Amino acid sequence: MEYNYPKFTPEMKKTHTILIPNMAITQFRLLEYALRYDGYKCEILGNCGSAVAQLGLKYVHNDTCYPALLVIDQFLDALNSGKYDLDHTALLITQTGGGCRASNYIHLLRKALVKAGYPQIPVASLNFSGLEKDSGFQMTIPLARRALACIFYGDMLCALRNQVAPYENEKGAADKMVEIGRAHV
């Protein structure tokens, strides 16, 4: 049976809040700025913990790779929270296009959304290989440049943090430095 999933349309850029899983907190928080600059209303999810990690097992096969399970768990927990208008919420997930199962996360997520009672939630794909041709999420050259700059800057902040953290005199000073650096983007 084929499921006709809801599409993320260009018009939804103005009306929908896009939820993004927290895969690399420093880089993704910076990426959030790039997406907002381009007109997208988005939010990086901060929900985590063992309760969140167990949620996806209700809707995803337990043989699914653990990172996929965690990402789907984050989305379902956020949708269950009551914090979002479910008729004006969309999800954004990356697709690698490689041999890893990560290219299938989007299909696992859509299936889990239907099972969890959220068939109306569109899922947009962030990929550079044309895997989802009907997505209204547009990766323009200016957005791609900003996104790459955010990822590189986030990588540098993380590398700097990892180098100075063992030598900090005040516990948490390295993390504060990352927050200050992130705030200056």
Can you say where each PLM-predicted feature lies in the sequence?
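An N-terminal assembly and electron-transfer interface module characteristic of large anaerobic redox
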Residues: 1-184
